[in-house]
Amino acid sequence: MKAGKSERERSGRRRHRSGDALTTVVVKQERLSPEPVAHRRPDAPAASLSPPAAEPGHSGHRGSRARSPAKKKSKSSGRRSKSPRTKRSQSPHYPMVKVKQEREDHPRRGREDRQHREPSEQEHRRARNSERDRHRGHSRQGRSSDERPVSGQDRDRDSQNLQAQEEERDFHNARRREHRQQNESAGSEAQEVIPRPAGNRSKEVPVKEKPSFELSGALLEDTNTFRGVVIKYSEPPEARIPKKRWRLYPFKNDEVLPVMYIHRQSAYLLGRHRRIADIPIDHPSCSKQHAVFQYRLVEYTRADGTVGRRVKPYIIDLGSGNGTFLNNKRIEPQRYYELKEKDVLKFGFSSREYVLLHESSDTSELDRKEDEDDEEEEMVSDS
């Protein structure tokens, strides 16, 4: 019994599988148009696969033919056979319709998607093409503008620009030339001429002034300190100690004061600041650093025309408030004035006078004044 049941189940499964295969085949056959088969076999029996008769009132090439009601499929259950055709007719229409709808919907969806996508893609393509056309148009315009023949106004403009540039160039070249000439003239003035022997007097070789790497300006002022006080003045490179013994003879009204020997240094600072002053001046009208007595090595011309060198005394005012007077004339500040024998110096409003003499000077007048002073003192003491 069990074996018979299993065989029946197997046979039923096989039939079901064969029926499913046939139905799938039938679905594929139904996709093909059945119309050409009907045209080929118009006298086919009632059991053929022709479609049902058209309803009255509908027009068509099939509607003209009358079909017998015997050809219609009977709905009675007694006439149904177990053939594969009946099984095919018994298969539900829903899966067939679903299959057809799915197959028909896919291309529709694809078309709709393409229709939705195409406008956006077309817009992007149009935008890209328009941008390319613009760039090409700009490049063509630039090329055409470069290739265009230059008009008269443009030529005039270019010529004016060239002229302006040439004028500026000439102006700058002239300025450079002037500066160069000035520098050359200044250098030639600073050069020293060294005479050659008598045979080669016509050719004189100028010697350039060597650069000085010594301190100057503010750096020199910072380093030029004495006893913790910054000195306003710095000695020049031609400063020398004199061989001649110069002296200063001070007088206060008619009173003769002690002689000052000023030949041991190259410079003497005169002022009210006793800490740094070499020759102190105690009058309140004088400045702390009032003036400087300086010896300098300078050139002079001899009687035979040759050039010699000599150390001479000079006085320079350091910008004092009340000034320095040479022979009762005020001198300019920050400027050297040469001193000669028997010159008289005064500083500020002080009543003291300083007479400049040296060891070989005629001091008879001074000796006479000293003798008179001594006689007056003796007379006063006797009385």
Swiss-Prot record:
Alphabetical list of SUPFAM superfamilies matching this protein: SMAD/FHA domain
Ranges of compositional bias, category Acidic residues: 370-383
Any Pfam family the entry gives: FHA
Post-translational modifications reported in the UniProt record: Degraded by the proteasome upon binding to the SMAD1/OAZ1/PSMB4 complex.
Coiled-coil positions: 153-194
Chain intervals with Basic and acidic residues compositional bias: 1-10, 28-43, 99-134, 143-159, 359-369
Positions of the UniProt region annotated as Disordered: 1-209, 359-383
Bias (Basic residues) ranges: 59-90
Cross-linked sites for Glycyl lysine isopeptide (Lys-Gly) (interchain with G-Cter in SUMO): 28
Signal peptide: none
Record cross-link Glycyl lysine isopeptide (Lys-Gly) (interchain with G-Cter in SUMO2), residues: 28, 100, 210
Keyword Protein biosynthesis listed: no
Residues the record lists as Phosphoserine modifications: 18, 33, 48, 50, 91, 145, 381
GO molecular-function term, one example from the UniProt record: transcription regulator inhibitor activity
Protein's name in the database: Smad nuclear-interacting protein 1
Gene: Snip1
